[in-house]
Amino acid sequence: MRPTAGQVFGSRYELVSRIAIGGMGEVWKANDGVIGRTVAIKILKDEYMGDPGFRERFRAEARHAALVNHEGIANVFDYGEEDGSAYLVMELVPGEALSSVLEREKILPATKVLKYVAQTAAALHAAHQAGLVHRDIKPGNLLITPDGTVKITDFGIARLADQVPLTATGQVMGTVQYLAPEQAGGKPASPLTDVYSLGIVAYEALAGKRPFRGESQVAIAMAQIKEAPPALPSSIPEEVRKL
């Protein structure tokens, strides 16, 4: 059954309005009736509740995000399962995803890109210090608040460095346009994987396009492994292009 406004989860979280619909579920604005704050609640789609792998990945998102306390990572407050549904309660971050910003503005000023990259890198460093690799850094997982603060979201496929993966050996996890070469080759991810993906995000924001293209996901993945990215436009400051 699809979530509806007024529905209550965990006897305390009342759904107010839908924020977004993603591949695994829906995100709603909700009121916490116990302590009186407004939160975001992600609800796993019904069709995935019968799949142990999806349910475990959903639980893992709660566990992983809770490992890191950093201003650049959206807080997770609660997790629950009831009546055939699973839900994740998170900090409600005002603003929009970087993907929406890029769709609207196409290219961002170098100063703004550097600011976003620095904030994201600091948050990733905190995650890496906790032994956590995000594995899916992309514009859609970077929320930009009205004051220009970056918040990383969606630790659903993140992995602890010393943890047995949730997926089969050699299975590729992540979004192909932002995959690091080792991910594209089915090898284990590391903190450098996130750094590479952040570099792809920066390239896209500066150039208005992604560095690697192809007619299929496989072709794009192979380009990540075998090709060097095209040079950034000469209109971008030299020190930024070198970085």
Protein language model regions, located:
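AlphaC helix of the eukaryotic protein kinase fold
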Residues: 43-67
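Protein kinase glycine-rich loop
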Residues: 15-22, 27
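Protein kinase catalytic-loop region centered on the HRD/HxD motif
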Residues: 120-132
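Activation-segment/catalytic-loop signature of the eukaryotic protein kinase fold
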Residues: 79
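Structural helix C-cap motif within protein kinase domains
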Residues: 207-211
